[in-house]
Amino acid sequence: MRVLVWNMNKQKRAWDYLRGHAKEFDVALLQETRDPRLMADPRWSSVVWRPKAGPPGSPRTLWGSAVIAPSLELEGYEPNEAFPWLGELAGSVAVARSSGSPTWFASLHTHASPVPQAVLDLHSWADAPLCAPNGTVWEQDLIPFELHRLFAGETFLWGGDLNSAEAMDDLGFVGGNRRLREIWREAGSRDLRGRFCTEEQQTFFRPNRRPYQLDHVFADPLTESRVLDWRVDTPAVAATPAFSDHAPIVVELERCN
């Protein structure tokens, strides 16, 4: 099984790239994608999309997160009251369930700024472990916290543009990115890069910006043990013009019998 994880930067051209490589992946976790129901090949089996709303008072949808599969049957997950943040932060996360393994797939695009207080007041977050030394609450705290509760006891794979890199902690950011990894590992997630690259690998290629790895993929230990390859697919950003300012991550898993 091959999984592609990609922030498409809202580019229509990115869909040309994705459709052209459809035979090379089984599941794609997409972020900053236009409505995939309008862009995907209509023959594809599964399209799960969670849009972000436009500005307050506007019915316009900007973009969203998606889980798609050309031939694998997936069922979109609709959060209930037990997972208020997965519902409240829709568009930052799309979740799908499979009858195979991994059982769960989730595509995340977490914000690069704290959750506003007006939003925090909507639901309890008291049980979520926080990463930032200054006590601010981030989507990176809330969404994986609820995902791990949802996934409990089942296999899973989640990832996307997390707007987080360990290297940020060394450059005057608010901090807490390394602590995030500790929290996620304690909750049962393993970074799928770990067996292939000891250091973070650049996935963000916007001109005049630091070369961070903002995109990451995690899974439960059993799924992690099936990983055959993890790599950054640089041709998507090497094209002129580039298909996106993020390069996809491709993860290859040994298929289950």
Feature locations, PLM:
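Short glycine-/acidic-enriched loop or helix-start segments at secondary-structure transitions
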Residues: 15, 37-41, 45-47, 117, ...
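Residues lining hydrophobic/aromatic ligand-binding pockets adjacent to catalytic sites
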Residues: 99, 118-120, 134-135, 139-151, ...
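Active-site-proximal beta-strand elements of phosphoester/diester hydrolases
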Residues: 1-10, 102-132
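Soluble or luminal CAZymes and related metallo-dependent hydrolases
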Residues: 10-17, 85-88, 130-144, 175-176, ...
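Metal-dependent phosphoester-hydrolase catalytic domains
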Residues: 79-84, 153-157, 164-257
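Active-site beta-strand/loop signature of hydrolases that rely on acidic residues for catalysis
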Residues: 2-8, 18-39, 105, 141-170, ...
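Short, solvent-exposed loop/turn segments at secondary-structure junctions
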Residues: 9-11, 34-36, 73-74, 110-113, ...
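Structured beta-strand-rich core segments of catalytic domains in phosphoester-bond hydrolases
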Residues: 27, 31-115
